[in-house]
Design a protein with these regions (language model features):
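Mid-domain alpha/beta scaffold segments of enzyme catalytic cores
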Residues: 1-264
């Protein structure tokens, strides 16, 4: 059984003490690929650490972008860094980018400007995006509809999706994949479970978003890629198929959107 963790933060300081062991555990669990996220606009930019890590392991790839929390720090230098790393052979996506109105760590208008700018970069470079949208689906949908109307909408992924099925249909119509995290296993997630049941088989992905969002029965612990098997099992249960068939479909989907071949 092959599993692709499409969004993780294993370069995070939370893993500094045991990163090699974490990687060994997820390889043993069936996770044979993982995407590691970089952000040049963090207070401590991590792109060098991320890309050093993915260069070390052939089964890792990377994405890079300015998270909406960090939109206020996006400038010409950050954009140059993103464009530089998009040329890296192991960089597959631009992200995570988007809108986060839960914390409002950057002003909303700044978030929207930076989000739209990065969508444009992705369109120009013909790379998929990885979107982080929290409590901002209305504005996000408006922006994506405008890009669709202009014919400048990149392909991509709704990362760690927690919205409704009605909203998911809009994102699917925009050509995006829906990626589900450990939140799928939570007891208070009936709407998310409805999404899992209904997303077309060829547009569904899973991820850990570790070290956050650990699934039941591990909720509250530091999350890691090996825990994704719990999310996989829940997705298979909801879709009434075997975990093996679920893993196969999800893996095929991930290879497709990441533009990778099954060589690891």
């Amino acid at each position: 059984m092959k599993i692709f963790d499409t969004h993780c933060h294993i370069a995070d300081p939370a893993f500094d003490e045991d990163r090699a062991e974490v990687i060994a555990r997820f390889r043993e669990s069936g996770v044979c690929r993982a995407n590691v996220v970089a952000d040049p606009c963090e207070e401590e930019p991590n792109q060098e650490k991320v890309f050093s890590l993915v260069e070390k392991y052939d089964f890792l790839c990377a994405s890079i972008g300015a998270h909406p929390h960090n939109a206020s720090r996006y400038d010409a230098a950050a954009e140059r860094t993103i464009l530089e790393y998009l040329n890296h052979p192991k960089c597959r996506l631009l992200g995570e980018i988007g809108l986060d109105y839960h914390y409002d760590l950057s002003p909303r208008e700044v978030q929207k400007d930076v989000f739209d700018r990065q969508l444009e970069l992705a369109w120009e470079r013909r790379v998929p995006v990885q979107l982080h949208i929290r409590e901002a689906h209305g504005d996000c949908m408006d922006m994506l509809r405008a890009r669709l109307a202009a014919g400048r909408m990149p392909s991509g992924i709704m990362h760690c999706y927690t919205g409704s099925w009605e909203a998911a249909k809009v994102y699917l119509d925009a050509g995006l994949y829906i990626s589900l995290s450990g939140a799928l296993t939570f007891k208070n997630a009936p709407k998310l479970q409805e999404v899992c049941r209904n997303v077309p088989a060829d547009r569904l992905l899973i991820e850990t978003d570790c070290p956050y969002m650990a699934p039941v029965p591990l909720r509250g612990r530091r999350n890691e890629p090996a825990f994704i098997t719990n999310t996989l099992a829940k997705a298979a249960e909801l879709r009434e198929i075997s975990p093996e068939r679920m893993a196969e479909q999800l893996y095929e989907n991930a290879l497709r959107i990441f533009g990778l071949r099954d060589e690891v």
